[in-house]
Regions:
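A short beta-turn/strand-edge loop motif at beta-sheet boundaries
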Residues: 24, 39-44
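Intrinsically disordered, low-complexity segments enriched in polar/charged residues with Gly/Pro
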Residues: 20, 35-37, 58, 70-71
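Tryptophan-paired
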Residues: 44-93
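Extracytoplasmic cysteine-anchoring/structural motifs
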Residues: 18-25, 72-157
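Sec-dependent bacterial lipoprotein signal peptides
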Residues: 1-18
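Bacterial Sec-dependent N-terminal signal peptides
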Residues: 15-36
Length: 157
């Protein structure tokens, strides 16, 4: 009887100790950025659209009041091209951002598909409305923290 109780208790403890990992909740790899002007965080008053390249898919469509962005990076390319289009009532301006990166395969568990983490190696832009871009965190993974500080030209420029 004692042996049977020990066996049942060990089975119960084993079942309780198992962790259920839901892959769909925790597997978004995103490159996060925030807009700054004159060293202060700002929101864009006008409409922002972001596409992957000139004729690529739309990553962000007609967003208004945008202060932060979540960019999906490509899986195997060493450099991604993103076109940011800002449209106001009487103007339209585009700036292109190139993000050079390395890609690392990341394996979480047998139940989850492999994902790719990235390491940002450099960022440049065409400087149409973006003054500069600082990489504040080069590692792009599951953590939802800012990777890029996108500095816009000051209002006086």
């Amino acid at each position: 009887m004692r042996r049977r109780l020990l066996y049942i208790a060990s089975i119960v403890l084993l079942l309780v100790a198992c962790e259920s990992y839901d892959c769909t909740l925790y597997n978004h790899v995103g490159c996060y950025g925030a807009f700054y002007q004159d060293s202060a965080s700002v929101s864009l008053d006008d409409t922002l659209t972001i596409t992957a390249g000139k004729s690529g898919p739309v990553l962000l469509n007609k967003s208004v009041g945008t202060s932060k962005i979540d960019l999906s990076l490509s899986y195997w390319q060493d450099e991604d091209t993103l076109v940011l289009t800002v449209k106001g009532t009487d103007y339209l301006v585009q700036d292109t951002i190139w993000i050079s990166k390395s890609n690392q395969v990341h394996y979480e568990s047998p139940d989850c598909p492999a994902t790719l983490f990235h390491t940002i190696q450099g960022v440049r832009s065409t400087h149409e409305f973006i003054d500069s871009i600082n990489v504040i965190r080069s590692s792009v993974n599951y953590e939802q923290t800012n990777n890029l500080q996108i500095h816009l030209f000051s209002a006086a420029d």
